[in-house]
Amino acid sequence: MSGLDGVKRTTPLQTHSIIISDQVPSDQDAHQYLRLRDQSEATQVMAEPGEGGSETVALPPPPPSEEGGVPQDAAGRGGTPQIRVVGGRGHVAIKAGQEEGQPPAEGLAAASVVMAADRSLKKGVQGGEKALEICGAQRSASELTAGAEAEAEEVKTGKCATVSAAVAERESAEVVKEGLAEKEVMEEQMEVEEQPPEGEEIEVAEEDRLEEEAREEEGPWPLHEALRMDPLEAIQLELDTVNAQADRAFQQLEHKFGRMRRHYLERRNYIIQNIPGFWMTAFRNHPQLSAMIRGQDAEMLRYITNLEVKELRHPRTGCKFKFFFRRNPYFRNKLIVKEYEVRSSGRVVSLSTPIIWRRGHEPQSFIRRNQDLICSFFTWFSDHSLPESDKIAEIIKEDLWPNPLQYYLLREGVRRARRRPLREPVEIPRPFGFQSG
């Protein structure tokens, strides 16, 4: 029977243990003890390590006791002692009985080796557990230390924030106090500056008294006059505003109704052109214009075919008179224009078309009557310096041109009975202006 026949397989374990007998080795043979220890180490190395398993190696049986009995194994079951080897895939039992020639001292030495190994393993396990306990304690201590440090840091941060807020409040309070102190100092300085010396106080009081006496002597008239002038100026400003609004509204109405009138004026002109001597009769029947028409002027007015009065681009800037003539023996012009323009300064400037007179028919510039110089009608076209020039233009524009029919029918009314009376024109009181035509 070979040594391997006694191999005994057991269930795999997580740890390996060494089973030894209860025999205590003696010091009989130190050499045998060392040899047995070397064999045990070699057997341990040769055993293949397994996955959590253990191998049991049987040691040589101890020698019989002195009483002649059979020695018992460690478990009390008898038989061969075994060594469980760490790292094996199974339990290998090597019976010591296979080696017949081994002395009893070898069993004692092997037992001592196994006991020493068991003690070292137990010490190792206990040392490992103690090391783990020490490591855990150190780890817990480090964690506690870190937590305490974090709490201390938070407390420190909170204290710093509180201290910073307190410092800021203290600084702001100091700034406010400094500002109040400076303000008080400035007020005291101003009070000191405002308080004049005693001599100056007397002079100021004397000046105030003199001023009051002067006011009493003047009386309440300036005050009442100022109270009256202020409302008067306010009323005048309001009146100017209303007048400006009225002027704008009047100009808008003039443009509007001027366009509406234009159609009727064109039809009227067409009819008047077919009435011989219409404008000459109207001029001669007018009570103011008739004084300027004498002799040759009346003959020349017989050739007037039409008259137009037109305003310039802006109603208040001026107007234009157009006289249309047919061929006549007195002058060559078929159209004579007289224009009045109001400048920005308010001055009225007149311009006219030069009359081309035929030879020997130049009119007399003035007619002497009752020691007065009276402007001739045709002189009105060429002479712009006489005051009567503007008066003629205003009469034609404001009176004759709006309704020439009433002056034409004056002479006709003398010769025939009129069916209805003429309606007197309504004069609108306004400054020198021009109607649309």
Swiss-Prot record:
In what ranges is there compositional bias, type Polar residues?
Answer: 11-26
Its localization reads: Nucleus, Nucleolus
Describe PTMs of this protein: Ubiquitinated by the CRL2(APPBP2) complex, which recognizes the Arg-Xaa-Xaa-Gly sequence at the C-terminus, leading to its degradation.
Q: Which residues constitute the cross-link Glycyl lysine isopeptide (Lys-Gly) (interchain with G-Cter in SUMO2)?
A: K156
- What InterPro entries does the entry give? NAP-like_sf, NAP_family
What does UniProt note about where in the body, tissue by tissue, this protein is expressed? Expressed in testis, ovary, liver, spleen, brain, kidney, prostate, lung, liver, and heart.
- UniProt GO cellular component terms: chromatin; nucleolus; nucleoplasm; nucleus
Keywords of the record, alphabetical order, are: Isopeptide bond, Nucleus, Ubl conjugation
Keyword Ubl conjugation recorded? yes
Q: Which disease is it linked to?
A: Sudden infant death with dysgenesis of the testes syndrome: Autosomal recessive disorder. Affected infants appear normal at birth, develop signs of visceroautonomic dysfunction early in life, and die before 12 months of age of abrupt cardiorespiratory arrest. Features included bradycardia, hypothermia, severe gastroesophageal reflux, laryngospasm, bronchospasm, and abnormal cardiorespiratory patterns during sleep.
Family the UniProt entry places it in:
Belongs to the nucleosome assembly protein (NAP) family.
What is the protein's name according to its record? Testis-specific Y-encoded-like protein 1
- Which species expresses this protein natively? Homo sapiens
